[in-house]
């Protein structure tokens, strides 16, 4: 009897578990572009085009390996519009004995798949996604009984499990974490050679035209599409990072420059998250570069920590916290997302630059997301669910399992410390130190109260003041609260009044 193997748009790996044991002569691989997935939020146009093009290329890759592939395009006349609808059509046409799929990355899709057996009356085999180092059960076991779920300790477990940068039971270099060496501020000499771009082929051009036709009002631009959409090109992007950028990645990973939004960042998250690259293979390539003298330890350790530390940890938190995690709102923030998050039109140069680049590229690196757009949303008291939705929509590497805990837990501290140890709140001083955005901004990061004062300054102190009862016991905020206490009552009043006046303009 034949089986139907469903592969999702973020599972584009030839080693995905659902392909185990496939009989190429009688089993059918199903890939489908469905409106339910393309429109549950208003995804960036480039995000939709990237995923659809990568899916179509993967289908061709599978056909080249001898698999039978059933592919449904978004604009096919008989497209049912959902995974359930497309699986039903395939079952009606092919009468398989069972359905096989690798577990999806999101609660929403998992709920849909859990209904397949009842809906179709045949066996459904949902397999664990072995692209990740830690299964849901393994993460639950690690988390059980711990007072706090500190990522650093989880990361060490992943180092031991993989053997990456290990000498027996000890970390290479005698330390687990070299983050203290990875905080160099922005300098003009950090400008790097451009990352590789990949010209759209015939398939990608067709996808771009389709996305522009079907999603004309979605966020973002389709011009200058340069994503890798094949495994071969994704591997070229990896090689370029290892050869040209990894050596300087560590020290400069927190820096921001107006003329080079990417600096030494890998730009590989798109390909890892959709399956074109394997996360462990990427880490091993970085480790080889260290052992061969091509990159220093602080750079390689920092890069590997992003993948087997933060990435794995965020997935674990997402499934541990459950589907209600999205409703977390520790600070009870309820302000709407400002219009300039969609347009980039604001006098705050850092916000304007990052959002404009997001519109154009469907990308910003992690410090831009955390300490510019995320920091502002936190300080301004934006509804965290609205912030989450924005990040999910605008970035091509954003899938809920990784984006949601990053936003709710890390960026907005909306879970009250379930994930992180303190809010990532900062004034204009941090932005000025780590970037050159302030050099051409109408606002002065060194001013707190004048007409040209950077809004981040008053907003920062107002955030601490209005949330004092919830944060005063956090020892990591003892210093800023001590500074606030030393200010005169008049200065404190004026800072809060300035913040209130600015926030009124947002409403």
Curated annotation (Swiss-Prot):
Name the keywords, alphabetized.
4Fe-4S, Chromophore, DNA damage, DNA repair, DNA-binding, FAD, Flavoprotein, Iron, Iron-sulfur, Lyase, Metal-binding, Nucleotide-binding
Could you say which residues bind FAD here? 265-269, 273, 363-366, 397, 406
| Cofactor(s), by name | FAD; 6,7-dimethyl-8-(1-D-ribityl)lumazine; [4Fe-4S] cluster
**Top-level taxonomy:** Bacteria, Pseudomonadati, Pseudomonadota, Alphaproteobacteria, Hyphomicrobiales
The record describes how the cofactor is bound as: Binds 1 FAD per subunit.
Identify the InterPro entries for this entry.
Crypto/Photolyase_FAD-like_sf, PhrB-like, Rossmann-like_a/b/a_fold, UV-DNA_repair_photolyase
One of the entry's Gene Ontology molecular-function terms is:
4 iron, 4 sulfur cluster binding
Q: Provide the binding site for 6,7-dimethyl-8-(1-D-ribityl)lumazine.
A: 9-10, 32-40, 105
Name the gene that codes for it: phrB
Q: What does this protein do?
A: Photolyase involved in the repair of UV-induced (6-4) lesions in DNA. Catalyzes the photoreactivation of (6-4) pyrimidine-pyrimidone photoproducts by using blue-light energy. Can repair (6-4) photoproducts in ssDNA as well as in dsDNA.
**Biological processes per GO annotation:** photoreactive repair
Gene null: resulting phenotype = Cells lacking this gene show a strongly attenuated photoreactivation after treatment with UV-B irradiation.
Report residues binding [4Fe-4S] cluster: 350, 438, 441, 454
Q: What is its EC number?
A: 4.1.99.13
Member of which family?
Belongs to the iron-sulfur bacterial cryptochrome/photolyase (FeS-BCP) family.
From the UniProt record, list the reaction(s) this protein catalyses.
Answer: (6-4) photoproduct (in DNA) = 2 pyrimidine residues (in DNA)
SUPFAM superfamilies to which the protein is assigned, alphabetical: Cryptochrome/photolyase FAD-binding domain
What's the protein name?
A: (6-4) photolyase
The record's listing under Pfam families reads: DPRP (PF04244)
């Amino acid at each position: 009897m034949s089986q139907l193997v469903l592969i999702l748009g973020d599972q584009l790996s030839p080693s995905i578990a659902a392909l185990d044991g496939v009989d190429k002569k009688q089993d059918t691989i199903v890939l489908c572009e469905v409106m339910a997935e393309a429109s549950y939020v208003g995804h960036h146009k480039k995000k939709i085009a990237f995923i659809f093009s990568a899916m179509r290329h993967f289908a061709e890759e599978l056909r080249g390996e001898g698999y039978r592939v059933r592919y449904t395009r978004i604009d096919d006349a008989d497209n049912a519009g959902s995974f359930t609808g497309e699986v039903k059509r395939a079952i009606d046409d092919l009468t398989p004995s069972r359905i096989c799929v690798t577990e999806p990355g999101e609660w929403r899709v998992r709920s849909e798949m859990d209904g397949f057996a009842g809906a179709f009356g045949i066996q459904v085999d949902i397999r664990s996604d072995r692209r990740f180092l830690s299964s849901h059960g393994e993460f639950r076991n690690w988390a059980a009984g711990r007072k706090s779920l500190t990522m650093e300790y989880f990361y060490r477990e992943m180092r031991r499990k993989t053997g990456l940068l290990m000498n027996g039971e000890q970390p290479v270099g005698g330390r687990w974490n070299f983050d203290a060496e990875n905080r160099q501020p922005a300098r003009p000499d950090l400008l790097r050679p451009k990352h590789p771009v990949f010209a759209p082929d015939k398939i990608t051009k067709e996808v771009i035209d389709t996305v522009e036709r079907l999603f004309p009002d979605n966020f973002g631009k389709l011009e200058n599409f340069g994503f890798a959409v094949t495994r071969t090109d994704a591997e070229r992007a990896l090689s370029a990072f290892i050869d040209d950028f990894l050596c300087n990645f560590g020290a400069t990973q927190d820096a921001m420059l107006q003329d080079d939004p990417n600096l030494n960042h890998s730009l590989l998250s798109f390909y890892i998250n959709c399956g074109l690259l394997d996360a462990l293979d990427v880490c091993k390539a970085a480790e080889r570069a260290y052992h061969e003298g091509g990159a220093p330890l602080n750079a390689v350790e920092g890069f590997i920590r992003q993948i087997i530390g933060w990435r794995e940890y965020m997935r674990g938190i997402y499934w541990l916290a459950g589907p209600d995690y999205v409703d977390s709102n520790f600070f009870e923030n309820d302000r709407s997302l400002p219009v300039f998050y969609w347009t980039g039109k604001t006098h705050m140069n850092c916000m304007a630059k990052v959002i404009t680049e997001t519109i154009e590229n469907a990308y910003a690196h992690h410090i831009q997301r955390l300490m510019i757009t995320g920091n502002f949303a936190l300080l301004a008291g934006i509804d965290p669910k609205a912030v989450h939705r924005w990040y999910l929509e605008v970035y091509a590497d954003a899938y809920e399992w990784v984006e949601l805990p990053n936003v709710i837990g890390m960026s907005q501290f909306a879970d009250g410390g379930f994930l992180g140890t303190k809010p990532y709140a900062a004034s204009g001083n941090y932005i000025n130190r780590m970037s050159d955005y302030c050099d051409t901004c109408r606002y002065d990061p060194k001013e707190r109260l004048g007409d040209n004062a950077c809004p981040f300054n008053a907003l920062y102190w107002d955030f601490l003041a209005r949330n004092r009862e919830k944060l005063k016991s956090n020892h990591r905020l003892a210093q800023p609260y001590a500074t606030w206490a030393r200010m005169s009552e008049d200065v404190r009043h004026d800072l809060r009044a300035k913040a209130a006046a600015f926030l009124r303009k947002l409403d």
